[in-house]
Curated annotation (Swiss-Prot):
This enzyme's EC code(s): 2.4.2.18
Gene for this chain: trpD
InterPro entries: Anthranilate_Pribosyl_Tfrase, Glycosyl_Trfase_fam3, Glycosyl_Trfase_fam3_N_dom, Glycosyl_Trfase_fam3_N_dom_sf, Nuc_phospho_transferase
Protein name stated in the entry: Anthranilate phosphoribosyltransferase
Organismal lineage: Bacteria, Pseudomonadati, Pseudomonadota, Gammaproteobacteria, Alteromonadales
Protein species of origin: Shewanella putrefaciens (strain CN-32 / ATCC BAA-453)
One Pfam family this sequence matches: Glycos_transf_3
GO cellular component: cytosol
Cofactor note: Binds 2 magnesium ions per monomer.
């Protein structure tokens, strides 16, 4: 295992210097190919973390991951209301909430958005998006062709990250041994193989909101909201949400309150989640229109922002209202049942 070809780049990092986007692409491509020892990988990730990753470094790492990913066979639309949207969080916010973004994906799709949700197993709670979906019998290992058919037929598909990004396995032992956040903690939402034009992306720290919006711009995302909601990696029902919105090539920063979204404030304790089986019951109740007000509102404000970002709603408030009416209709639960059926019809 030789890293001679990237040693000059490693030396730059060890000197506290920044890498260009192209250099970051080269060094992370080597990692993905399994050409880097665990010791070298740990040194690289810690060097980046201690200095603080730049926009170019995050973008280059995402470029490498995207280039190496299994292809998702889908032709994206390129206009508002037509392209693909993802509702995703970095995880790692430390709160054990219900599966808000995953549940919101069903609501947004039932309201007319084309949602390709890129997810993994739990990071910040007892139940990640993939843990939850497995409870409903949704086949996480569905082939890319099957996922594409789901997106065509149902406006929704889930792309299980390890199924598309096999090279990440090389970093697993190092990430576990380091026991600290690294660049990989923000890469997941940036490497959706469907290449969504529109994104609602939650981050675990308010310091990441603007930088990640800049990364999305560098990666060619058309329109996005990057959010941190009073400790959560999603739009908050219990306090203010910090937003960096990417629109028409510009990034504007502002804050949202629950009142701005047309819903009352709730306590974070009202959103506490549990194990996958318990969270599945909560998600089912929400999607059937039988959830608590706090649960329904938390999901609706996130689905509503996604509907705004992808152009179906003209404001976050009207998006939230559309999401709430979709929840009450029960359409989102019908969609869940259909996805479970279609996703399991064809095995790879």
């Amino acid at each position: 295992m030789s890293t001679n070809h990237i040693q000059p780049l490693l030396d730059l990092l060890y000197q506290g210097k920044s890498l260009s986007r192209e250099q970051a692409f080269e060094i992370f491509s080597a990692l993905i190919r399994g050409e880097m020892s665990e010791a070298t990988m740990a040194g690289m990730l810690v060097a980046l973390k201690m200095r603080g990753e730049t926009i170019d470094e995050i973008s280059g790492a995402a470029d490498a991951m995207r280039a190496a990913a299994k292809t998702f066979p889908y032709s994206n639309g390129d206009s508002l209301g037509n392209g693909i949207v993802d509702i995703v969080g970095t995880g790692g916010d430390g709160f054990n909430t219900i599966n808000i973004s995953t549940t919101a994906a069903f609501v947004a799709a039932a309201a007319g958005a084309k949602v390709a949700k890129h997810g993994n197993r739990s990071v910040s709670s007892k139940s990640g998006s993939s843990d939850l979906l497995a409870q409903f019998g949704i086949d996480l290992t569905m082939s890319p062709d099957t996922a594409s058919r789901c997106l065509d037929a149902l406006n929704l598909c889930f792309l299980f990250a390890p199924h598309y990004h096999g090279g990440v396995k090389h970093a697993g032992p190092v990430r576990q041994a380091l026991k600290t956040r690294t660049l990989f903690n923000v890469l997941g939402p940036l490497i959706n193989p469907a290449r969504p034009e529109f994104m609602l992306l939650g981050v675990y720290s308010p310091e990441l909101v603007l930088p990640i919006a800049k990364v999305l711009k560098a990666l060619g995302t058309k329109r996005a909201m990057v959010v941190h909601g009073s400790g959560l990696d999603e739009v908050a029902l219990h306090g203010n949400t910090q937003v960096a919105e990417l629109k028409d090539g510009d990034i504007i920063e502002y804050q949202l309150t629950p009142a701005d979204l047309g819903v009352p404030l709730a306590q974070i304790s009202e959103l506490e989640g549990g194990e996958p089986a318990q969270n599945a019951l909560i998600t089912e109740a929400i999607l059937r229109g039988r959830g608590t007000d706090a649960h329904a509102n938390a999901v609706a404000i996130n689905a509503g922002c996604a509907l705004y970002v992808c152009g179906i709603a003209d404001s976050v408030k009207t998006g939230t209202l559309l999401a709430l009416s979709t929840i009450q209709s029960g359409k989102a639960f019908e969609l869940l049942s259909q996805l479970a059926k279609v996703s399991s019809e064809t095995k790879e």
